[in-house]
Amino acid sequence: MDKKKNISMAVIRRLPKYHRYLEELLKSDVDRISSKELSEKIGFTASQIRQDLNCFGDFGQQGYGYNVKDLSREVDNILGLTKMYNTIIIGAGNIGQAIANYINFQKMGFDLKAIFDINPKLIGLKIQDVEVRDVDNIDGFLQKNKIDIGIICVPSKNAQKVCDIIVKNNVNGIWNFAPVDLMTPENVIVENVHLSESLLTLSCLLQEVNKSRD
């Protein structure tokens, strides 16, 4: 049986961190590393690391550790970084522009094809050589172009409408920055980034720390 088919969501959530640290090790010309050494760098227990990496195959060798290059390549493959995803951004405000300007976007395999907005002052603006288009034209664009991922950076009141349009046009991946839970078919994958919820989580944790000090 292919172990990759049984990777849990918890492991998937940890994969980007493995990717980041393995990239750093490669840049430092590190050829191999033990689970104990990786544990000290990444913050997971050595046992957890061994369990996680066992999902990908038999990469560790007793007395040798992990081959950093091989493991990095496999993590990249699991994360889908060996592919290129056609991507659009809907909403060219502060968050949308920040994402469009992210220098590693293309390197990670996300090819930004278009940006859309409703604001006439933003339409025609170029961000990283990608022109902001009128959102009224998004339907026609999607009918002519195969897009894999839609990045939603619009106010919550407009998010579901935008979601419905891109899903109707066979966009199966959504990165949602709008502070609302979207309704989508089962075959559409939504990754929510609710900034306010993250900030409130931090606030709650700080409050607990402060209580323990009182």
UniProtKB/Swiss-Prot annotation:
Start-end of DNA-binding region: 17-56
Keywords: Cytoplasm, DNA-binding, NAD, Repressor, Transcription, Transcription regulation
GO molecular function: DNA binding; DNA-binding transcription factor activity
Methyltransferase keyword on record: no
Entry-linked SMART domains: CoA_binding
Main location group: cytoplasm
Annotated Pfam families: CoA_binding, Put_DNA-bind_N
Protein's UniProt keywords contain Acetylation: no
Entry-linked InterPro entries: CoA-bd (IPR003781), NAD(P)-bd_dom_sf (IPR036291), Rex_DNA-bd_C_dom (IPR009718), Tscrpt_rep_Rex (IPR022876), WH-like_DNA-bd_sf (IPR036388), WH_DNA-bd_sf (IPR036390)
Compartment(s) where it occurs, according to its Swiss-Prot or TrEMBL record: Cytoplasm
Binding residues annotated for NAD(+), in chain numbering: G91, A92, G93, N94, I95, G96
Highest taxon of the lineage: Bacteria
GO biological process: negative regulation of DNA-templated transcription; response to redox state
GO cellular component entries: cytoplasm
Record note on quaternary structure: Homodimer.
NCBIfam families (alphabetical): PRK05472.1-3, PRK05472.1-4, PRK05472.2-2, PRK05472.2-3, PRK05472.2-4, PRK05472.2-5
Function: Modulates transcription in response to changes in cellular NADH/NAD(+) redox state.
Family: Belongs to the transcriptional regulatory Rex family.
Official protein name in the record: Redox-sensing transcriptional repressor Rex
Source species of the chain: Clostridium acetobutylicum (strain ATCC 824 / DSM 792 / JCM 1419 / IAM 19013 / LMG 5710 / NBRC 13948 / NRRL B-527 / VKM B-1787 / 2291 / W)
Gene responsible for this protein: rex
